[in-house]
Amino acid sequence: MKRKAEKQQATAPVSAFAARKARQQQAQLVEPEKTAQNEPAVEPPSKRARWSPEEGAARQAANGNDRVQTRRSTRRKAETLSSELAEKQPQRSAAAARAQIAERTPAPEKGDAETSDAAEEEEEDILERENGVGVIAAEDDAEGYESPADDVPQVQNFPLSKTRLNKSNIVFSDERTLCVRIKEKMTLVLLGHYDLWVKRGVISLMGAKLHPSPRLYRVYAPSTHSLPVIKCVAGVDGEAEIEVKSCNSGIYRLRHLSPLYQRIWNGKNTAADKLTLKKASASTKRTFSVLYTSSDDSWNRHLRPLHLEKQWSSAIRSLSQRGGRLKVLICGPKASGKSTFSRYLLNHLLSPAPQTENNHRNTDGVAFLDLDPGQPEFSPMGQVYLAHLRSPFFGPPFTHPSLAESQDGSIIRSHHIGVTSPKEDPDHYVLAAMDLMDRYRALLASYPQCPLIINYPGWIFGLGLEVATWLVKSLGLSDVVYMSEKGPAEVVEPLGHAAQEARVPLTTLPSQPTDFVSRSSAQLRSMQVQSYFHMSHPSEIHNPQWLDTTMSRSRPLVVDYAGPRQGIRGIMVMGSQISPDLLHEALDGALVGVVAVESPNAIMGQADTAGFSGSSQRDATQGAEDLSGAASDVDMNDVTDASHGDVAPTSSSSVESMITRTPNEDLPYLFVGSGSCNPLDPKASNCLGLALVRSIDVPSRKLELITPIPGSKLRDALEQGHGIVLVRGMLDNPSWAISEDYYAARAAEKHHQELVAKARKETDTRDGRDAAGDADTQGMVSALLRDRIRRASNVPWMTVIEDNSRRHREAAQREKSLWKLRKKAYPGSESETDW
């Protein structure tokens, strides 16, 4: 009957009204069948693209509107309006449907976060808590700026763990601990931060093979990076036994100070967590969660396991066989996996079996030469350094931004480049790299079996390629690894020629692209620097701790920059020359490198001398007496002028003679050069760390510095007669430090609101007088917290937008989505997305 109806329709009159009426009659016949079968269309598919479900629903609505046209007197006008509506309504309805989906999607996510946070604050403050202003949720990525909508279900349900917890493999569990058995070649993925204890068997974790020992390994697994995979590689009776414990490192507190740290740890309890917490209360939370798939995450984030490609694993095994003779340079394009490969190789070298195949035991540690000032591994941005490491590290760089007072490693020497890319001053960069290499050769005298890993930045084109090939020829390497099989040829060929000339094997490995990155490079740098300033390393414990005290409330280091007790020898501004009148504005609120100058002739191109002497050393001795606050233990009263002798520096070329005092503030402006400032010579200077200039007190000629540099490190530098110079580079502005008070105030207000909501539930058991008194107190506290937020939002250089309209939300959503990066895996890469 349907075919017959279609044939009759084809022979109908061709007038516009007749054709329109025939289509309306056909729609009336088809509509009941559509409703019964719930299908978008019953006719054969046309040449046009297939409708999405929203467009199909909109077209049905449009057809329904067309059927209400009944009056013949206005049939031509109605026919015109209906045809326009039939063409425009599907697009408008589809757009409206998409807009409604985009607005409704974050709603359950926010609700889950608030409910979970309330329960967590009641028990123990160890997990995520929203403070109202955070980064865009991963669920919002379903809009898809580059990826099609069909990829979203796959992204949100990615397999993570092969092991499924049950009664047979759970040894025991309580509110803080989970002990499980993992079969060989099976994996387990955890989200959060925890302490790992290997009790039986051998497991692999981020390149390290961990054997049974009494040691606890601290593991940080945030959602900002691919999650570490715990894999059983050998077991007793085919199983390995591990114990995972909650830890209170304090790093979760940073979410109160920055939205970049929000929603990066575990959320609500997963199904596996509930299975292991049956005997505990419903509000019990651990600092970690067991995930089977990415859909187990209550916040629907894009989670991925950290898997290595087969070629990576074989290359790591081959390189580790060289033992103490290994000196490898790892280079490649940006985002090719250089840091990941370096971290895996480092952990593999630091955790060999008790007796390896080549009878090599790593007792001398591993030297790590980091030449990437933009994304360093063990220091804040803007530095290149040589580190001596003795234990594996499990976590992204912002979980170990410094090795000061660490038992797992130390910084041998560091140089402040002052930029995130070495292309700004390649000469200074190369000299710093060569000086660090000389320090490694000196380290071999004490640790002859210490291998070397060199991490080169993604600056591999143009002048960066020339620097890379020169390093290959000059550093005496044993291996070169290039992290890309796709070239380009103009990079691989010169690199291969340089390796061939130096008689060094060149290994080419496939890059490991990431499907989703939730933080941009600039945001990761901000997280790392903020972690650097809030981290402390108490001597009583093995692992570091983080505090959520804002920078404005931290105790500063007060030092004189002029007068008889001068502690700062000079202030250098890298890059183009600025007027001395602008030095105050350039320095106030900036990040500066604290550099110890080992010679008065420390400017690039000058002769080296033994050290500061005469009046310079006496000034340094007196200047140390005014160091107070965070480094109050620094005292130079025991240092005498005779400790280093009297070696008269050359007045025409010494640092002291190159200082110009600013006319208004009397700041010691150190500038040498023509047009741009010559940097300090790496052979005569050493960077101690970073500091934030909180204020400049002009009447008293003092600087207030916030710095995590240990006081013992400053004292040692001053006792050796070194002068302290502050170097103002071209690093990212510390906007995170300006907004910390605002986010802390918001977090305090939300915490108070949660306590008030909890107290209201308990008012039924009290009399009315007590309830009224509590309400008055709560109202006063709320008013004080609102005033605190108001004052924190009025600081300079920051604008708080309170507009919560739909237009503002959409604009903010588009702006935050700009840094959501996607990199597709190419066919044959064997990466996790090439399935």
UniProtKB/Swiss-Prot annotation:
Q: Where is the composition biased (Low complexity)?
A: 91-105
Region annotation (Disordered) maps to 1-132, 608-658, 758-777
GO terms classed as biological process: cleavage in ITS2 between 5.8S rRNA and LSU-rRNA of tricistronic rRNA transcript (SSU-rRNA, 5.8S rRNA, LSU-rRNA); rRNA processing
- Alphabetical keyword list: ATP-binding, Kinase, Nucleotide-binding, Nucleus, rRNA processing, Transferase
**What InterPro entries does the record point to?**
Clp1/Grc3, CLP1_P, P-loop_NTPase
Name the residues that bind ATP.
G332, P333, K334, A335, S336, G337, K338, S339
Instruction: Give GO MF terms, alphabetically.
Output: ATP binding; polynucleotide 5'-hydroxyl-kinase activity
Name the residue ranges with Basic and acidic residues bias: 758-772
Q: Which GO terms describe its cellular component?
A: nucleolus
Q: Bias regions of kind Polar residues — which residues?
A: 649-658
Listed Acidic residues bias regions: 114-127
- Which domain of life does this protein belong to? Eukaryota
Q: Gene3D superfamilies this protein is in? A: P-loop containing nucleotide triphosphate hydrolases
Where located?
Nucleus, Nucleolus
EC no.? 2.7.1.-
Q: Which PANTHER family match?
A: CLEAVAGE/POLYADENYLATION FACTOR IA SUBUNIT CLP1P, POLYNUCLEOTIDE 5'-HYDROXYL-KINASE NOL9
> Could you say which protein family the record assigns here?
Belongs to the Clp1 family. NOL9/GRC3 subfamily.
Tell me the function of this protein: Polynucleotide 5'-kinase involved in rRNA processing.
Q: Please give the name of this protein.
A: Polynucleotide 5'-hydroxyl-kinase grc3
